[in-house]
Regions:
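A short helix-loop
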Residues: 2-7, 11-15, 22, 31-33, ...
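Glycine-rich phosphate-binding/hydrolytic loop that grips phosphoryl groups
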Residues: 123-126, 300-328
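Short beta-strand-loop/turn "lid" adjacent to the catalytic site in phosphate-handling enzymes
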Residues: 65-103, 108
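A contiguous, well-structured pocket-lining segment that forms one wall/lid of small-molecule binding clefts
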Residues: 199-270, 276-299, 317-326
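Active-site nucleophile and cofactor-binding loops and adjacent substrate-binding regions
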Residues: 93-98, 114-121, 142-144, 171-174, ...
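Conserved phosphate-binding catalytic cores of ATP/NTP-utilizing and phosphoryl-transfer enzymes
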Residues: 1-6, 112, 116-140, 314-316
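Short, well-ordered amphipathic alpha-helical segments that serve as non-catalytic structural scaffolds
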Residues: 36, 55-70, 253-258
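Short glycine-rich, Thr/Ser-proximal phosphate-binding strand/loop in the N-terminal lobe
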Residues: 15-54, 160-167, 299
């Protein structure tokens, strides 16, 4: 028996809009990765935390049934869960307590290791999965999801598996995810609307002559002005062109912010994570623009950009292996 392949770590992430469970072997092969999107009412721009908690409880029951199929062939040696949104003091959201306590219950019942991480660290680790990035010890990461748009300076701590994460840019008001979702809902799409906006933008053959005005200074972006501009023309233009305008503004905002921050910190590698990073339009256009400045973009597969639990499981594997090495 190959213990590295048969011993697995379970990862759990219960975010604002997705319930996720993953299982990864000690050699970091993905054995299991499933997720369930939370249900959001039609014409709504989000979900209350209390409703999210309720749905996570039901979803974890369903996902754990699927996880049972692993029990005969694999040995669960640890569980790693995202306990809070970000690795800072006072970071808290009720939805994460569901996954945390569910993971605790699994760990206690199986008498295996229990590890904690955060939703943001989960995203970063998942985005590094199968990445060709040259310097994993110091790089920029752009975390852009439903409620977050942050540009992060990620530095490996000395003699540690953990990263030091410093916010060095981002949005000062709403996030890109909020801009995209609000626009999509106004166009009649279900929330979250990113996949519809992305499809529209890719299919739109009309050339943008005058894009939306952007507001970027020292790596920080203001997006409420973009939303106001969209609201003024949303009834006058077709949905595909509106979608293209929105994602074009995402690309141009990020280009301005990232070229500034990259040069300021002397870093030429950027890792992208979060649901907005799954956009094909953003990936293709932003990568091309940054490459002209000798800045290299790393996007993972869409299923690892959007909410998932693979990053949690990877972090769990690293912590488990480090403990095993120290105990030898």
């Amino acid at each position: 028996m190959n213990l590295k392949k048969n011993n697995i770590i379970i990862g759990i992430d219960t975010s604002c809009y997705t319930t996720s469970i993953a299982a990864i072997s000690l050699d970091k092969s993905i054995i299991f990765s499933e997720k369930i999107m939370l249900n959001v009412k039609k014409n709504s721009n989000g979900l209350r935390q209390s409703e999210g908690v309720f749905q996570h409880i039901n979803n974890l029951g369903e996902l754990s049934e699927n996880l049972k199929s692993l029990y005969d062939d694999y040995n669960i040696v640890g569980v790693c869960v995202s306990k809070k949104p970000r690795p800072i003091e006072n970071s808290y959201m009720p939805v994460f307590t569901v996954g945390y306590n569910f993971g605790k219950a699994i760990s206690n019942s199986l008498n295996c290791k229990f590890y904690e991480t955060t939703h943001q660290e989960n995203h970063i680790e998942a985005s590094l999965l199968n990445s060709n990035i040259l310097n994993r010890d110091r790089f920029l990461s752009v975390h852009m999801s439903g409620g977050t748009t942050e540009i992060l300076l990620v530095t490996k701590k000395n003699n540690s598996l953990e990263y030091s994460i410093e916010i060095v840019g981002g949005t000062k008001d709403i996030s890109f995810g909020q801009l995209i979702d609000r626009t999509g809902v106004k166009l009649g799409y279900d929330f979250p609307a990113g996949k519809y906006i992305d499809k529209n933008a890719i299919e739109c053959e009309r050339k943008i002559l005058n894009g939306l005005k952007t507001s970027v200074k020292d790596g920080y972006m203001n997006l409420s002005g973009l939303e106001n501009q969209i609201n003024k023309i949303i009834e006058l233009e077709d949905s595909k062109y509106i979608s293209k305008l929105v994602l074009d503004s995402v690309v141009r905002n990020l280009y301005k912010a990232l070229t500034y921050i990259s040069k300021l910190n002397n870093i030429d590698e950027i890792v992208f994570c979060g649901g907005v990073a799954a956009s094909e339009y953003v990936r293709n256009n932003l990568s091309l623009k940054l490459k002209k400045e000798n800045i290299y973009s790393y996007f993972t597969k869409p299923e690892y950009s959007t909410d998932n639990a693979c990053g949690c499981a990877i972090i769990g594997v690293d912590k488990y292996e480090a403990e095993s090495f120290r105990n030898k």
